[in-house]
Amino acid sequence: MTGGVATICLSDLQCREAGLQGVMLSIYGNSSGRFCDGLSRRNFLKIGGLGMGGLALPELLKASANSGGGKREKSIIMIYLPGGPPHQDMYDLKMDAPREIRGEFKPIPTSVPGVQISEMLPKIARQMHRSTAIRSVVGARDEHSNHICFTGHPLGAQRPPGGWPTFGAVISKMQGAKNPAMPPFVGLENKMKHRPYNAATPGFCGVAHKSFRPEGDGKADMTLKGIDLERLKDRMGLLKSFDQFRRDVDAEGLMDGMDAFNQQAFGILTSSRLAEALDYSKEDPRTIEMYGKGDKAIRGDAAPRILEQFLVARRLVEAGVRVVTVAFSFWDWHGNNYGNARKDMPMFDQGVSALIQDLHDRGLNKDVAVCVWGEFGRTPKINKNGGRDHWPRVSCALLAGGGMKHGQVIGATDRLGGEAAERPGHFME
């Protein structure tokens, strides 16, 4: 996470006072300040020899409190591309490579002199001065799962007790809600047919920090764990519903953290703030038109191409949600790579570029970071079916907002697009 999403800064002394020893995981903070080792660059916290699994919450809270600050609240929108998008056909075209590698698409200039991306992404190209393309993401495994994008760890990696938490769960636990009427972490993605696309969990952070999943198009259909709003006519009915819910959950051994969950749910269900944020029909028609109309049909065994969810994500962070996650389409194109790209990329281009523009227009670009990526890249060589196969050695990402310095490309691959040649960046970063 970059650009101050975690908003944590510690000095050497603060690290020692908080009892933080041994370093593995870095959570980046604001662009001013010092490293724990005294070097002036990004502020960050390095936590525990076993990552965050070795650090108790009181220590984290003490460390965060000691950092002081009064910093501006940050949010993040993460757009997950299930299946693994083809980096060679998006942000890292290889026009000097052999034909079976370079493919059909041509590069086009962007709003940043000297930076080119695929002709299939003309609207993102016009937003490149507000974006950063990372061409050297590493650390993936050959496994179709959202786990590495949501936690930084492969699904099959060694886990601490409880499992690795999603970054949204970590932020929920460490920072809590900005507003009691809004959950800190909202997942807009549908439950996907390929189960590992849904694999990420709150892990050792606990079930109270699981993403809130609104269902339906807006407040009329909003449910919370099967509790229909229409049945909750008064607070007594609400409490009775939660009592039954607690008994059901207790039978499954998940009571730990339910008090916090109930408090959050009570605030959500007794306020109209969340329902109003989900109801984008009240948005300016020109803004709705900018995002465009999506397609609710499920692609492959993954997600639909719903452009409206990008608008809803913006509305949610504006209303006070810290983390919003979205899944878009299905990118596992072992065949007909270019036919699929011509169907999906124009919609992807419109939705992502509209989000970047909208955040800028509303003055949210310094406080809301956007991260777009999938679980791995694709093979340099196009196969006999006109597709690209799995390639975990390197992949790509697109960043925007978050107060980060944009208008640049980070990292590079070799001449065939198969290996990270410059500035490899791990998913955990």
Model regions: which residues?
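Ligand-binding pockets and gating/stacking loops
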Residues: V5-C9, L13-C15, G19-E429
